[in-house]
């Protein structure tokens, strides 16, 4: 059985379990390929579904399987952590791969991690609620920078995200043309 079939069966099984038990069940964080499989197979689910990555435009998302007879409030099991250098004066500039590498070095499965958001000199991690305390206790160094993690709210993270609207003329419906227009790069 290939990876796509396995993902499809896993999602359908979660839907059946949620329907049978009458409770909301959640997937792990799904990557873009798994989200594509989820969207292609929504017609096979026995429950309603909803996907969220914790912030708008999140790349990695959790899917909630919601039974029809649901009568209680629920929330996505998502935690938001801010990564702060303990000694800002001596801190290195960290990148996405530095943070992800340190998290993976803790032996954590990638499916427990959501997006890593970097805004200016602030770093945020979106993860499953069940893993937040583990990261707070065990992640103390990224590259050569000593760090501490602290929980924040989704609002604090959303305030850090900045979007910019760009106007321009795109000569063809190709990705390289769009990137050239937005970032003022030559296509060559």
What are the functions of these language-model segments?
Residues 1-185:
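Ferredoxin-like alpha/beta domains used as RNA- or RNAP-binding modules
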């Amino acid at each position: 059985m290939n990876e796509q079939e396995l993902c499809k069966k896993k999602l359908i099984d979660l839907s059946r379990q949620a329907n049978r038990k009458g409770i909301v069940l959640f997937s792990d964080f799904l990557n873009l390929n798994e989200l594509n499989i989820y969207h292609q197979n929504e017609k096979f689910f026995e429950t309603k579904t909803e996907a969220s990555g914790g912030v708008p435009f999140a790349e990695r998302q959790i899917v909630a399987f919601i039974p029809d007879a649901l009568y209680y409030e629920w929330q996505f099991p998502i935690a938001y952590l801010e990564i702060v250098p303990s000694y800002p004066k001596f801190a290195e500039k960290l990148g996405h791969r530095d943070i992800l590498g340190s998290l993976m070095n803790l032996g954590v499965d990638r499916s427990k991690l959501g997006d890593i958001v970097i805004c200016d000199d602030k770093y945020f991690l979106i993860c499953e609620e069940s893993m937040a305390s583990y990261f707070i206790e065990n992640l103390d160094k990224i590259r050569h920078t000593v760090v501490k993690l602290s929980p924040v709210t989704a609002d604090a993270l959303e305030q850090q995200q900045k979007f910019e609207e760009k106007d321009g003329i795109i000569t063809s419906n190709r990705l390289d043309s769009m990137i050239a227009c937005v970032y003022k790069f030559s296509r060559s």
